[in-house]
Amino acid sequence: MIIDTILLLATEAKEAAAEGFGINTDILGTNLFNLSILLGLIIFYGRKVLGQILGERQSKIAEALAEAENRKNIAATALAEEQKKLALAKQEAEKIIDNSRSRAKAVTADIAAQAELDIQRMRESAAKDLSAEQDRVLVELRQRITALALANVESQLSTGLEESVQQTLIDRSLANLGGK
């Protein structure tokens, strides 16, 4: 049906062309003429629209570039600031580590000195305890010797020693014990 309509229009156009107005069915002749008119209209009216569209696009691209540049500058500033903070933090960490090492050395030295003092004190205490024990043993031995000597003297006295001999024996025993 559409084809019939087109054919009908084409035949009427041919008849009308003979009269002066109608559709020209010569494809090569009409297409070049129509294309040149269409191209002229597009250039004349399209230039303004296309220029406006391209101008808007150019301004949007320029704004996007400016915004990107601004964000880049802000990011660079923030990066520099954070790098400074990082450097300061590293310096502070080094100070803390150095202080900790110094403190550890000082504490180690203090502990070693205190341990040495404790060892010295223990040695002195042990020496005093040993000396006191020796003194106690010596006193106990002297007391036993004295008791044995007195017992020996008493037994000899009871057997009948003379009084002058007894006195000499007592004096000698006391002198041996450190009495006189």
UniProtKB/Swiss-Prot annotation:
Cellular compartments per GO CC: plasma membrane-derived thylakoid membrane; proton-transporting ATP synthase complex
Membrane topology category: Single-pass membrane protein
Keywords, ordered alphabetically: ATP synthesis, CF(0), Hydrogen ion transport, Ion transport, Membrane, Thylakoid, Transmembrane, Transmembrane helix, Transport
Chain segments annotated as transmembrane: 32-50
UniProt main location, coarse: membrane
Pfam families, sorted: ATP-synt_B (PF00430)
Cellular compartment(s): Cellular thylakoid membrane
GO molecular function: proton-transporting ATP synthase activity, rotational mechanism
The keyword Thylakoid is assigned to this record: yes
Free-text function comment from the UniProt entry: F(1)F(0) ATP synthase produces ATP from ADP in the presence of a proton or sodium gradient. F-type ATPases consist of two structural domains, F(1) containing the extramembraneous catalytic core and F(0) containing the membrane proton channel, linked together by a central stalk and a peripheral stalk. During catalysis, ATP synthesis in the catalytic domain of F(1) is coupled via a rotary mechanism of the central stalk subunits to proton translocation.
Family: Belongs to the ATPase B chain family.
NCBIfam families in alphabetical order: ATP_synt_b, PRK07352.1
PANTHER family reported for this sequence: ATP SYNTHASE SUBUNIT B, CHLOROPLASTIC (PTHR34264:SF3)
Quaternary organization: F-type ATPases have 2 components, F(1) - the catalytic core - and F(0) - the membrane proton channel. F(1) has five subunits: alpha(3), beta(3), gamma(1), delta(1), epsilon(1). F(0) has four main subunits: a(1), b(1), b'(1) and c(10-14). The alpha and beta chains form an alternating ring which encloses part of the gamma chain. F(1) is attached to F(0) by a central stalk formed by the gamma and epsilon chains, while a peripheral stalk is formed by the delta, b and b' chains.
Protein name: ATP synthase subunit b
Originating species: Microcystis aeruginosa (strain NIES-843 / IAM M-2473)
